[in-house]
Amino acid sequence: MDQRLFFPATERNRVPIGDRLKTVLPARGVVLELASGSGEHAVAFQQRFPGLRWQASDPNPDHRTSINSWIRHAGLDHVMPHALDLESSNDHGTSPAMSRTI
């Protein structure tokens, strides 16, 4: 079952946001995105900036499910770690991608 959420604003603003991020992000490293929502931005930016490892997070379990669904849909399971719940002390990023280095 497809559990991806779609937020209309993402379609409109991912290119301008990505253009701005390109001017400030390093070529390599890890980015922690707070309150990632549907996960559409996280996946788009992971694809646009392959030298970075994009770590999505969201306190809403439905959003984390959507983020992980977007990651799977984009075929980024082995590149992007699963979404984190930064409000939970039990979530330690157990995704296999977490141990990869760039």
What kind of region is each of these model predictions?
Residues 44-91:
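Class I SAM-dependent methyltransferase SAM/SAH-binding core
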Residues 8, 36, 57-58:
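Conserved residues at beta->alpha junctions
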Residues 1-28:
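Class I SAM-dependent methyltransferase Rossmann-like catalytic core
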